[in-house]
Amino acid sequence: ALPISSSHTVGPMRASNRFIAELIDANLLDRVSRIHVDLYGSLAATGAGHGTMSAALKGLCGFVPETICIADAEAMMQRNSVDGTLPLAGYPSQAYTGGAPGSEDGKVYGPVLSYREAEMTLRPLTVLPRHTNGMKITAFAGEQILAERTYFSIGGGFVVEGDEEATGGASLSNPPYPFGSGAELLQLANDAGLSIAELKMANECSVRSEQEVRAGILGIRQVMKECIGSSLSRVGYLPGPLKVRCRAGAWHRDLMAEDPEKSAEFATDWVNLIALAVNEENAFGGRVVTAPTNGASGIIPAVLHYAMNYTPGIRHCGQAAREDAVVKFFLAAASIGALYKKRASISGAEVGCQGE
């Protein structure tokens, strides 16, 4: 996932990339001569601090949160800041310098336009009816409007268009164990003799194989580990004018010297360290997992770290058993998190950062 904020950074990137995909599907991309982005409500009011405008440009250039190469994206933004270059759907290769659309390796690339963050229209006092995080993207051919879409970033990186119903990932339209509340979840699990994780796995297997579910979960876990490792190796100051010093790396070195065996006495210190490390990596613009949001993305890795290192029966298990524990952990967490998303909110704009 992209750094900083799930609703203000990940969502806008997804929305603008989705807009480009719709242009490609409609065979309109090569006709675009100009593009414009309007930001509304909270996206406009706090967009500068969350990297909203930059994220929208990156999405227009073909970057997506799941696979974004931070170095490539920043190189593109650096060039944009110098000459305004905006390659719709990205560059076919490093050597590509033309302005004409084309394709390479089966991927479609659009025209290279000129458009900067400063040209976006910010409307912080205008809140669209559906959600406070609204954005409109318009593509022009000369003065003619080719396409215009309004998107809403509803929290957790999820994006909807207009009156579209909110969904995330593959839709579990006919799961064997549908539930809409905690009480229903517990009752279904008890009646079926299943744990919450087992019930959730059965539901997930209605749209993908168990092997695919496991691979996806373990892939997410690997990204979390890489995020933590990257943060613990950083030194210096966090980005921004306040000159906040990085703390996770130094704290990790001190804690390793004081508690090399990870004794129970220091469990809370390790949990807090992992959460801080993820948050600092997010502030640096590194890759984090939006679970449930970027602002709260340190909690799941921190709790999982505790589970893997301090839970009896897991700490000294073999690799296969530890992977099973990770899968169960994520399935149970997803079941509970889905209820928060459905029955309340995971959007900081709606429930605040503590709500996340």
Residue ranges and their predicted role:
Residues 28-30, 127-131, 280-282:
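Solvent-exposed alpha-helices and their adjacent loops that cap or buttress functional pockets
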